[in-house]
Amino acid sequence: MSPVLTQHVSQPITLDEQTQKMKRHLLQDIRRSAYVYRVDCGGCNACEIEIFAAITPVFDAERFGIKVVSSPRHADILLFTGAVTRAMRMPALRAYESAPDHKICVSYGACGVGGGIFHDLYSVWGGSDTIVPIDVWIPGCPPTPAATIHGFAVALGLLQQKIHAVDYRDPTGVTMQPLWPQIPPSQRIAIEREARRLAGYRQGREICDRLLRHLSDDPTGNRVNTWLRDADDPRLNSIVQQLFRVLRGLHD
């Protein structure tokens, strides 16, 4: 009896719910592909590498109808990368003015979002939001291809809203409660800034969130002590002690 060959048998392709939703946006609402134009405002090209990785067959952003074009006059989505330098400010503005309405502006990468490590240089204006109105932010240094495609998905939803002039407003009287209402905003901001300075953006935010959660549940600090004892990490202990010094300085 001859063996059954399986390597050349065609397998059906199944799409997840998010992919199907994006395709419905393109086919029913936008009714055409969404064209993306890159505006390099003065970056190191790491963001460009990730953008091109996102449109390769591995991640295949084109399956959602997302295509990169070479002229802003054809673009629906403008993708601003890099910190805005003085030399690139006017070219970036010309690209923005050349793109037809209704356009979506995306700030891509840490430098595009807020200037990154170059934010305070004499030749840098800051993030791309200093020169154009930004609709979508994609943070990262650089953002991953998965984060890039997710940002494109958000941009597609906004593009649909702009094309059909859809506006959303919160119901009257509805307010958002802070995550930790027991802790004043000034203290939360000071702790988060110091934690990010000591441990970086990602780990600093995680340490800050966990510390605030423990302090919110147990102001006596017993849960914080248990957390530090279980972690058994001298570096974490040093960071948390510094954050407590910041808190005491605010109370003094």
UniProtKB/Swiss-Prot annotation:
Keyword entries, A-Z: 4Fe-4S, Iron, Iron-sulfur, Metal-binding, Oxidoreductase
Enzyme nomenclature, EC number: 1.-.-.-
Residue numbers binding [4Fe-4S] cluster: C41, C47, C111, C141
Cofactor field: [4Fe-4S] cluster
Pfam families recorded: Oxidored_q6
Gene Ontology molecular function terms on file: 4 iron, 4 sulfur cluster binding; metal ion binding; NADH dehydrogenase (ubiquinone) activity; quinone binding
Cofactor note: Binds 1 [4Fe-4S] cluster.
Gene3D superfamilies: 3.40.50.12280
InterPro entries: Complex_I_20kDa-like (IPR052375), NADH_UbQ_OxRdtase-like_20kDa (IPR006137), NADH_UQ_OxRdtase_20Kd_su (IPR006138)
Enzyme superclass (EC): oxidoreductase
Family membership: Belongs to the complex I 20 kDa subunit family.
Its job: Possible component of hydrogenase 4.
Official protein name in the record: Hydrogenase-4 component I
Species: Escherichia coli (strain K12)
Organism lineage string: Bacteria, Pseudomonadati, Pseudomonadota, Gammaproteobacteria, Enterobacterales
